[in-house]
Amino acid sequence: VANDIQRLKIEQIKIRDERAATNKVYRDIARAESIKDIIASAIVPYDKNDFLNIVQYEGSGHDLIVCLSDLHTGAGIDSAWNKFDKEILKARLESYVTQVFNIVERHAAEKIHVLLLGDLINGHIHINTRVQNNENSIEQVMTAAELVSNFVAELYEVCQHIDVYSVSGNHSRVFPNKDEQVVGDELEALIPFYMKARLQNLAGIEVKTDKLDPTFGGFKARNSLVMYAHGDKDSPSNVVEHLTMMVKQPIDLVFLGHRHTNGMTTVHGTKVIESGCVCGTDSFAVGLRKNDVPQQAVAVIDDGGLECLYDVKLEKPAKIVI
């Protein structure tokens, strides 16, 4: 009898535990439903009058800043990563012009600022540079001047207000030893004067030959103060400080070449934009284990400053066969 009573009590406890567990599930469900009811009762459905009165943006018009940096005209490259010669240079510039046409149309650009950011020629400053060259330095200058003039003339088809600014790069030094070089005595400094004569009959194109210094310059694009340099004497991290101290006023945008790859960073509120190269990966870059496609940068400027930046690829990456 005692064992039966003990067994009965055990079963009663089991039943109570099961009932408690079941009730807990019911309580959780009830609480969840209560929370849903509370939320539903607290929410007021949207009414069209509740939305903000959005004022439609009216475009202020746009300028384009079209970079043309590090062509390295005269170089001959034939590697697994890149092929480059005069004909390929022409093809890449044609690709660039076509893409700029689309950008002009997309943003209804009213004016184009073309920045020649240096190293338009390959020069003869290093032994490996001289080995790569297919043309001597004078031929390189003439070829680059004609190709860049054609580039600007083609842009004129879609925009009749074009200003051209230029700075020389380190590859156009007259003397290979940079300690012997006189600032401003670079070979590619001749290119803007060639362009000025070549383009003189196209009203609306102005090739600027006066600048603050042979190594950097500046201009206004709508309301923005824009500075530019080749990049061999400055880095993206210090160029804002350097040039701000030189001009004694805040700078909105700085454009650099030299490093052969597109990029953008912000330093103290100033946008530093780097434009890549047209020549593509050379033996020097391969030695550093760096490889990228030929590329240039195009900036769209409105009255408020930089609106957008285009990463323009001039060619697809090479397929490496191992």
Mark where each language-model region is.
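Basic, amphipathic N-terminal segments that precede the first structured/catalytic domain
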Residues: V1-H107, Q296-A299, D303-I322
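Core catalytic region of metal-dependent phosphoesterases/phosphodiesterases
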Residues: F51-L68, S79-A197
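Beta-strand-turn-beta hairpins that frame and shape the catalytic cleft
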Residues: Y57-I65, G218-M227, G269-T270
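A glycine-rich, aromatic-flanked flexible loop/lid motif
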Residues: V164-G169, T215-F216, K220-A221
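Conserved beta-sheet core of the metallophosphoesterase superfamily
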Residues: R173, D185-A189, K196-A203, K208, ...
